């Protein structure tokens, strides 16, 4: 049976008229604190700066299955959206009480709750400010202004990505130099294009490391050879060449604000793109990462050599 992730998100209207958001998602470089605040701000018609985010704290945060499996923006984002929608409705209910009318007769613009004028007159003629609502919420009030929403999804629509790489390959040494990497990503609607772009660039760097450098080998006694970063090679900024990222947007109806995930797809394209580029340069396919200079040289010397393991003896 497939295990579904379960995410909770809590939002609270503070007594000064700003918002506190409590999340269990850990920001591991994805920018989830910023993105989730943007989503809540969109629903509540406020600035992201008006939302104070309290990150993962196992003593206080609502439950979160974990920041993995490309789930934060897509699943935690939906919990955030639902919590913000519920809080918005509760703010309208308190505002309607102060205005002496039904909740169906008012709306909220982020700064005040106002009576909707069906005749098209000035909507702001009769209103109550958010700060007054925040004060009212603390005294003689039974409508909660701190809400928690839970979300779980049986599906996770896949993102798509195209990766294209230009390399320079030295046939004397087998060394590969990346000159240019072009990426086009469909992750739905990017909530924060800048964060999505740098996450894509970081994922491409990880994928290049997996494809060309990173490897773990053991000797016959089971001792690991790459036991520090002098032996375990990872790419630096100088090793990944020029990276250009573009987005092809699409709207995903099951995600919050049309988003899809982006976390893992960006790591997947460098290895096959580099394998194809090496094939175009040498005429030999390599199907086992990393594509080290030793493997490339052995492949050029013997086209029938099918990825013999270069293990430490």
PLM segments and residue spans:
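C-terminal catalytic domains of large/alpha subunits in multi-subunit enzymes
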Residues: 1, 39-313
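Short, small-residue-biased leader/transition segments that mark boundaries at the very start
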Residues: 2-7
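Extended lipid/amphipathic-ligand handling interfaces
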Residues: 11-12
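Residue-level signal for tight coil/turn positions that link beta-strands
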Residues: 15-16, 110
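Short, aliphatic-rich beta-strand segments
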Residues: 18-23, 178-180
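Gly/Ser-rich, acidic/histidine-flanked active-site/gating loops
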Residues: 26
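Thiamine diphosphate
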Residues: 32-39
């Amino acid at each position: 049976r497939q295990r579904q992730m379960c995410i909770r998100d809590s939002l609270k209207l503070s007594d000064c008229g700003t918002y506190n958001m409590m999340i269990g998602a850990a920001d591991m470089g994805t920018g989830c604190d910023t993105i989730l605040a943007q989503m809540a701000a969109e629903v509540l018609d406020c600035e992201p700066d008006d939302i104070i985010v309290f990150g993962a704290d196992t003593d206080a945060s609502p439950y979160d299955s974990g920041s993995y499996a490309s789930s934060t923006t897509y699943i935690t984002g939906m919990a955030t959206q639902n919590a913000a929608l519920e809080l918005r409705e509760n703010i309208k209910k308190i505002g309607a009480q102060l205005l002496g009318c039904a909740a169906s007769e008012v709306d909220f613009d982020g700064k005040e709750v106002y009576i909707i004028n069906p005749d098209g007159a000035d909507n702001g003629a009769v209103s109550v400010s958010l700060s007054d609502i925040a004060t009212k919420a603390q005294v003689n009030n039974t409508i909660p202004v701190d809400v928690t929403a839970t979300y779980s999804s049986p599906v996770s629509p896949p993102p798509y990505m195209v990766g294209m790489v230009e390399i320079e390959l030295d046939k004397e040494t087998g060394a590969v130099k990346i000159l240019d990497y072009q990426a086009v990503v469909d992750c739905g609607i990017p909530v924060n294009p800048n964060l999505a772009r740098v996450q894509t660039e970081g994922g491409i760097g990880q994928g290049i490391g997996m494809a060309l450098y990173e490897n773990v080998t053991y000797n016959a006694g089971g001792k690991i050879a790459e036991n520090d970063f002098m032996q375990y090679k990872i790419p630096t900024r100088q090793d990944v060449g020029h990276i250009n990222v573009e987005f092809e947007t699409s709207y995903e109806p099951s995600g919050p604000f049309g988003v899809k995930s982006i976390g893992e797809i960006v790591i997947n394209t460098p290895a096959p793109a580099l394998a194809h580029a090496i094939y175009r340069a040498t005429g030999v396919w390599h199907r086992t990462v990393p594509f080290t200079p030793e493997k490339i040289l052995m492949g050029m010397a013997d086209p029938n050599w099918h990825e013999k393991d270069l293990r430490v003896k």
